[in-house]
């Protein structure tokens, strides 16, 4: 009887785990360039990453986050969140102790 009870509990736990695992919906677009850079990283990710609007805390060391909204996140981003819109609006939620270089010139583009 105890063995049957353990089997039932294990089956229920496995079913709940699989249900929770398959219920997660991920809205992702396949970008071959970011896929290749994730698989074969050569250290250029940080060099190619950029941010026009970077916010930092006043703590020492500062905690900085890029608040740019774009169609895709840069290749060095680990936590990219995209809105369900067309075109997609994505924002990187990584935090660092520094800001990336600016993507555009500080002059207003026409």
Curated annotation (Swiss-Prot):
Residues 1-28 form the signal peptide. Residues 29-42 form a propeptide. Inhibitor of trypsin and of chymotrypsin. Belongs to the Bowman-Birk serine protease inhibitor family. One of its GO terms (molecular function) is serine-type endopeptidase inhibitor activity. SUPFAM superfamilies: Bowman-Birk inhibitor, BBI (SSF57247). InterPro entries: Bowman-Birk_prot_inh, Prot_inh_BBI. CDD domains: BBI. Monomer. This is Bowman-Birk type proteinase inhibitor. The record marks 84-85 as: Reactive bond for chymotrypsin. Disulfide bonds join 50-103, 51-66, 54-99, 56-64, 73-80, 77-92, 82-90. SMART domains: BowB. It comes from the Eukaryota. The record marks 58-59 as: Reactive bond for trypsin. Keywords: Disulfide bond, Protease inhibitor, Serine protease inhibitor, Signal. One of its GO terms (cellular component) is extracellular region.
